[in-house]
């Protein structure tokens, strides 16, 4: 790809410059798509918490908090864009340890809500709930990218595969213990995508797939009863319409009720559980219709395309893998989240990036986008 070109530039002694001219490399399309998707998320937060329920607007309103998190995300985006992304490569292991500490802390003092009330997924700080597993997704993209970038010359070695699996193991197990099946699947999918795009041996990727299959009994044993029921009813939600199949049935009803143009913002009538997070696309389809739902999917397609363009244009392995990892992570979450709503995949609790309510998710995504913009600004290229 572009790795040999990067090595040639370094041998010639050329170093990237991050001056004002570098801003012509800023990917404004990428940021625009992310902002538009976040705007859809704000609209859904308003509809779910203010418009349809007529709640008073207070500091504790999810809509107001979504705006606050949006402002914080913009600041994080600007800061991470300004910093040289290369420090992340040397700081990846401290980040990994911080990630482990946060996940252990979640198990120790975490709280759960709703159906998953026995799960320890959120840590309450100053009245705000933080889901550190959302941060773990982005941190692990950085860690995987740094690990594989350092081993590009031996990427086909089985020891490289074994090593990165050992890196995945601790956070994956800690997330599964919460239990958070959705995030554990995202971590595995992200790593698999990165291994494939970094040129790992297909033989060893097949071995990795076999390992994942072999781990299914362990994963099943760690799942809560309601999670197992969700999987067992995916083929026929009407087998338990008031229990495990209720969410899928309501989501499909909402999508069908929206029609082509939707019922209008705040006019949704179908009751959906976790309507601001896991099933937000169902609410969006009901209120904004098929047109609105498709527009969101088109925006995601364009966003992922720009991420892949960033990866293609990167001139060194770490930057390339960062972009590819984030593209893989977002793609997997979108496919599974929409699949949950229309009943094609089990309900696993995976949010819709940028659109689902959640401060930790939005801020971590903003940090990821800012880091990718930093790679664009500092792209190694000769001066003509």
Task: Kindly give the residue locations of the regions a language model identified.
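Long extracytoplasmic/lumenal interhelical loops at the membrane interface
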Residues: 255-291, 314, 318
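A juxtamembrane structural motif centered on a specific transmembrane helix
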Residues: 1-17, 338-384
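Transmembrane helix boundary and interhelical junction motifs in multipass membrane proteins
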Residues: 180-185, 261-264, 275-277, 290-294, ...
């Amino acid at each position: 790809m572009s790795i040999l070109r990067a090595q040639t530039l370094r041998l010639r002694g050329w170093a990237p410059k991050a001056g004002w001219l570098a801003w012509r490399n800023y990917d404004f399309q990428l940021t625009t798509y992310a902002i538009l998707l976040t705007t859809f998320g704000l609209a859904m937060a308003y509809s779910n918490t203010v418009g349809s329920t007529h709640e008073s607007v207070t500091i504790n309103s999810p809509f107001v908090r979504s705006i606050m998190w949006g402002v914080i995300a913009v600041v994080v985006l600007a800061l991470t864009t300004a910093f040289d992304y290369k420090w992340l490569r040397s700081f990846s292991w401290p980040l990994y340890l911080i990630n482990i500490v946060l996940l252990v802390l979640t198990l120790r003092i975490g709280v759960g809500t709703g159906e998953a009330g026995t799960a320890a997924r959120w840590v309450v700080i100053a009245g705000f709930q933080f889901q550190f597993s959302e941060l773990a997704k982005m941190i692990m993209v950085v860690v995987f990218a740094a690990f594989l970038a350092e081993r590009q010359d031996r990427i086909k070695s089985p020891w490289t595969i074994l090593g990165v699996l050992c890196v995945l193991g601790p956070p994956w197990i800690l997330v599964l213990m919460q239990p958070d099946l959705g995030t554990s699947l995202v971590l595995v999918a992200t790593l698999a995508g990165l291994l494939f795009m970094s040129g790992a041996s297909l033989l060893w990727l097949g071995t990795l797939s076999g390992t994942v299959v072999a781990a299914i009994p362990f994963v099943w044993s760690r799942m809560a009863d309601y999670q197992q029921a969700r999987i067992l009813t995916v083929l026929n939600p009407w087998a338990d319409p008031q229990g495990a199949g209720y969410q899928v049935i309501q989501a499909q009803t909402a999508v069908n009720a929206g029609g082509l143009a939707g019922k209008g913002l705040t006019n949704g009538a179908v009751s959906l559980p976790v309507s601001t997070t896991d099933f937000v696309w169902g609410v969006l389809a009901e209120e904004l219709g098929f047109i609105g739902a498709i527009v969101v999917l088109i925006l995601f397609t364009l966003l992922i395309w720009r991420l892949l363009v960033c990866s293609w244009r990167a001139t060194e392995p770490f930057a390339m893998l960062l972009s590819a990892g984030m593209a893989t992570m977002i793609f997997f979450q979108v496919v599974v989240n929409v699949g949950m709503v229309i009943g094609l995949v089990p309900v696993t609790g995976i949010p819709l990036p940028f659109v689902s309510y959640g401060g930790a998710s939005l801020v971590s995504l903003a940090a990821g986008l800012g880091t990718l913009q930093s790679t664009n600004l500092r792209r190694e290229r000769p001066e003509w």
